[in-house]
């Protein structure tokens, strides 16, 4: 009679990486449940997470290294050994570096994000400035908008202490299972919720106020809310006078965005705009929760988000209890994430075209120009791509990018499934799922969790970092951290927290780090903002300096796609809105 054992592990289909109790029988995954020891989950999983068996045992999984045996895009591959695969990669990437220079090779990371620091280390060891990720069309645009104002990493809302929560393009029930649990508990507590979303979602249904705007008009709505807040004297004068740069110009600009005018632009009734502004500014502390991509997936996307983020500053809700806060809970230092810097001694993709991207420390190449650097005569040409989870379907002009992938001298994709993008590759390598590998997780509140390997890797699939280590060893690339082995790498990540890998493994429910950094608020009182002015910049000096050369504007100026594009709106009245999460679907390594 087979015995069922429960393995503490994680689901890494999407960013939150929910903790999972995996039920294993005879070495096979038999079922999954959300971990019950975590307050945010309480045993819950989304539809994708609950379908783990369909995901892990999908018949379309790539299980062996596969070398192209036909024309690019034809989809004909032959099975080879890992030694042959490593030899093929080393031979081609070393040849291309010798012939064209290291910058002619791109190192690309899709999802999940756990292996990104290791891939960046590989790019650095190779000598290429062209480490890039799917965030070129996703999160980094939102992060850039934030940094242009505050100069630091994005600060989410201090959820346990908010009195008003404004959800801007954030459908928690479909995109963040742990956070949706906290959201439900806050609703029971009686907080006010304003939801900004073109769609009537489950989250919007629960809100006190739903601002159902026309897609792409977020900037006009935010500027109109600012107009009301300033006009009705609801802004935080003390904070603005002491810590904000460019308020006068900002104030003058927003005066034109009355709720009456904004109603015509956004479709949101003027009275609802006024009510939302008064609620957010007057019933605080208030926090804004935003998502990575829907707002920025439009013309003027970065400026639209800058208009949204500016509301936090003018109401004094920055880095205060219940507002958008840098460190609302204890935290613990770790190595790797955000610590590995990109090799920048040569020009990267997009550096001439998007200088603010690099000035604002995105610390990766701007991959939106990848197809151009392959197909056209740019400053230099990209000849090779080493990718982990590249899917052309998420990029603008996807067919052009797929065509470009077919023109490369050499292209590797590490994947779970044989996507169209993988069919263009010279070599496809099999990655394993989170159920087939070990991993350490640094979580909110300074908590750490060891994700156990529930089952052995299917076929000859490997974890992504072990693949990176294998390639680097074969190529003779040097990195003192990675080449010590995977266990040593996990140990290295944990070292600043004051815990060992062995300790963490002995705490199946997770454990607190030892070198805790306490919560903080109003850090700006002792430390200046990391902006050129040392203040919150409603008028960005970084963007302003590129006004003449690139047309960037320091204020969060609103440009309407309906009046500034040549598309016939009568013939094409519909507006594409992207970036939402479908609760029951995933695609390759995207969710």
Feature roles, as predicted:
Residues 110-111, 242-245, 280, 324-335, ...:
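A glycine-rich phosphate-binding loop feature that marks nucleotide/adenosyl-phosphate handling sites
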Residues 64, 68-84, 98, 227, ...:
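N-terminal leader/propeptide and maturation segments of large enzyme subunits in energy/redox metabolism
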Residues 71, 206-207, 256-260, 289-295, ...:
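Flexible glycine/proline-enriched surface loops and loop-helix/loop-strand junctions
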Residues 280-378, 445, 518, 527, ...:
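A glycine-rich, hydrophobic/aromatic-adjacent loop/helix-cap motif
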Residues 105-113, 264-268, 291-298, 331-332, ...:
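Conserved short loop/turn motifs at secondary-structure junctions
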Residues 52, 75-79, 149-155, 169-173, ...:
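Hydrophobic alpha-helical scaffolding
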Residues 2, 6-10, 162-167, 171-206, ...:
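A cross-kingdom feature strongest in bacterial/archaeal respiratory oxidoreductases
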């Amino acid at each position: 009679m087979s015995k069922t054992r429960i393995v503490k592990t994680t689901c890494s289909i999407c960013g939150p990486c929910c903790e999972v109790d995996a039920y294993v029988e005879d070495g096979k995954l038999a079922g999954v449940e959300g971990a019950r020891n975590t307050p945010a989950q309480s045993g819950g999983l989304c539809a994708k997470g609950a379908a783990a068996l369909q995901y892990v045992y999908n018949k379309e999984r790539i299980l062996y290294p596969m070398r192209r045996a036909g024309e690019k895009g034809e989809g004909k591959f032959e099975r080879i050994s890992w030694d042959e695969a490593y030899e093929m990669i080393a031979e081609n990437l070393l040849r291309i570096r010798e012939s064209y220079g290291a910058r002619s090779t791109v190192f690309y990371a899709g999802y999940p994000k756990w292996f990104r620091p290791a891939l960046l280390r590989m790019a650095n060891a190779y000598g290429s400035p062209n480490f890039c990720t799917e965030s070129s069309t996703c999160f980094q645009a939102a992060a850039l908008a934030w940094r242009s104002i505050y100069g630091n990493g994005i600060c989410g809302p201090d959820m346990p202490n908010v009195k008003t929560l404004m959800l801007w393009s954030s459908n928690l029930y479909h995109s963040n299972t742990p956070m949706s649990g906290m959201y439900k508990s806050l609703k029971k507590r009686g907080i006010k919720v304003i939801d900004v979303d073109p769609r009537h979602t489950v989250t919007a249904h629960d809100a006190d106020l739903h601002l159902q705007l026309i897609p792409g008009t977020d900037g006009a709505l935010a500027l109109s809310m600012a107009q009301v807040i300033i006009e009705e004297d609801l802004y935080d004068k003390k904070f603005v006078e002491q810590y904000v740069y460019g308020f006068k110009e900002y104030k003058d600009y927003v005066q034109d965005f009355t709720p009456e005018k904004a109603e015509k632009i956004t479709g949101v009734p003027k009275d609802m705009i006024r009510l939302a502004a008064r609620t957010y500014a007057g019933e605080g502390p208030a926090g804004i929760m935003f998502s990575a991509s829907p707002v920025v997936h439009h013309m003027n996307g970065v400026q639209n988000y800058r208009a949204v983020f500016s509301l936090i500053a003018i109401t004094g809700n920055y880095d205060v209890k219940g507002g958008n806060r840098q460190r609302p809970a204890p935290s613990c230092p770790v190595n790797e994430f955000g610590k590995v810097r990109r090799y920048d001694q040569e020009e990267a993709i997009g550096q001439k075209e998007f200088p603010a991207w690099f000035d604002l420390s995105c610390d990766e190449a701007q991959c939106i120009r990848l197809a151009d650097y392959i197909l056209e005569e740019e400053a230099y040409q990209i000849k090779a791509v080493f990718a982990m989870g590249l899917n052309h379907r998420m990029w603008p002009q996807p067919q052009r990018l797929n065509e470009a992938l077919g023109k490369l001298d050499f292209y590797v994709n590490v994947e779970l499934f044989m996507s169209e993008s993988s069919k263009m590759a010279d070599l496809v390598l099999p990655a394993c799922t989170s159920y087939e590998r070990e991993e350490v997780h640094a979580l909110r509140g300074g908590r750490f969790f060891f994700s156990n390997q529930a089952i052995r890797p299917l076929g000859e699939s490997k974890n992504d970092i072990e693949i990176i280590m294998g390639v680097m060893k074969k190529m003779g690339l040097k990195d003192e951290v990675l080449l010590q082995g995977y266990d040593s790498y996990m140990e290295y990540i944990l070292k600043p927290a004051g815990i060992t890998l062995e300790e963490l493994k002995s705490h199946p429910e997770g454990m607190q780090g030892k070198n805790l950094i306490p919560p903080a608020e109003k850090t700006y009182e002792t430390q200046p903002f990391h902006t050129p002015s040392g203040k919150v910049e409603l008028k960005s000096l970084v963007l302003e300096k590129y006004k003449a050369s690139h047309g960037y504007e320091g204020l969060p100026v609103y440009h309407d796609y309906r009046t500034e594009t040549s598309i016939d709106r009568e013939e094409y009245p519909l507006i594409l809105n992207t970036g939402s999460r479908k609760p029951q679907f995933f695609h390759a390594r995207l969710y």
